[in-house]
Amino acid sequence: MKLKITILSLVISFLPSISFADAYIENKHGKITWRDCKLFYVYDDYKKDEIIPTIRYIETISNFTFRKWKKSMKKQPHIEIYYLGSSDSNVLGRTTLMDSHNKARINNVYVSMFTKDQDVLLHELLHGIGLAHSDDPNSLMYPYDSENQVLTEQDLINIRNIPCGSKV
């Protein structure tokens, strides 16, 4: 089975952003999508009160619901979230989307965190459900971290329009 990997990172920098033409992550087959709106998650080295509020918040602004993943569900697509401690680079978090057979369907997502900052976690989890970077420096989805970034109205519209399940 061939796997295609897409990596997205949030970096601390004051360099100008590369502008993104589309609001959703794409590969050569189209927009990356989940086959179901019910997603499973598992996390390591996070406390429940550090991660669950972010997951519940995403449920309120998207079409997705989240349930805790169990080892017996190995074949079920899921999001794995890992805190890896601090990094020597400026990378705060990284999301790796995996799709099999070169299709635009997500099998698994791996979120690697180098900080426990809630905004960075939200940014990376939104990549995990399919949202790309924004070219708006005020947006939480802007690829470079700065003070006072929020989810903009356009971000919220894009999040609600991420296709999943029967909406694909």
Spans of model-derived segments:
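Classical Sec-dependent N-terminal signal peptides that target proteins to the secretory pathway
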Residues: K2-F20
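Zinc-dependent metalloendopeptidases
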Residues: S19-V168
